[in-house]
Amino acid sequence: MAKTPKKDKTEEKEEHEESGGNKEDRERAYEVLATRVNPIASPLAARKLTKRLYKTVKKASKEKNIRKGIRDVQKFIKKGERGIVLIAGDTTPIEVYCHLPVVCEDAKIPYCYVPAKQDLGEAAGSKRPTCCVLLKPNESYQSSYDECLTDVTTLPRPI
């Protein structure tokens, strides 16, 4: 058996753009991802908010101004860092991150769930899925960060 040749990055981008298709396909893809989230994934960001959050995470990752992974996020929350915590809703088992919303509430840090850990990892600049990201404020993307912050804080909290 021979290995299959790797694709060029430009070919992958073209395929990704083609798979994005039209608006109806993207909405349907979000709806499918939203049905696959865990039962504790509340508050779940809406489609437009999710897209805006991913764009802000991409900007922050270029500035090296994010924390990825449960361990890092929890460590820096305990040290007093502020920001928005994004948690992937499709992470299994739930026990891996079920304590994180409580940690965020104790530190008075806003948090929300996004539907897919793969998309969150790609937005964070990683090839691997990421189940948690701490998004810190910065001057270069402050306006989009502020919009995301107001939207995340207005999401209804679970009981």
Swiss-Prot record:
Any one Gene Ontology BP term: rRNA pseudouridine synthesis
Gene Ontology MF, one: RNA binding
Keyword field contains Cell membrane: no
Region annotation (Disordered) ranges: 1-28
Keywords of the record: Nucleus, Ribonucleoprotein, Ribosome biogenesis, RNA-binding, rRNA processing
Compartment(s) where it occurs, according to its Swiss-Prot or TrEMBL record: Nucleus, Nucleolus
Coarse class of the protein's main subcellular location: nucleus
InterPro entries in alphabetical order: eL8/uL1-like, H/ACA_rnp_Nhp2-like, Ribosomal_eL30-like_sf, Ribosomal_eL8/eL30/eS12/Gad45, Ribosomal_eL8/Nhp2
Any Pfam family: Ribosomal_L7Ae
GO CC, one annotated term: nucleolus
Highest taxon listed in the record's lineage: Eukaryota
Keyword Transport: no
Family assignment from sequence similarity: Belongs to the eukaryotic ribosomal protein eL8 family.
Assembly notes: Component of the small nucleolar ribonucleoprotein particle containing H/ACA-type snoRNAs (H/ACA snoRNPs). Component of the telomerase holoenzyme complex.
Function: Required for ribosome biogenesis. Part of a complex which catalyzes pseudouridylation of rRNA. This involves the isomerization of uridine such that the ribose is subsequently attached to C5, instead of the normal N1. Pseudouridine ('psi') residues may serve to stabilize the conformation of rRNAs.
Protein name, per record: H/ACA ribonucleoprotein complex subunit 2-like protein
Upper classification of the organism: Eukaryota, Metazoa, Chordata, Cephalochordata, Leptocardii
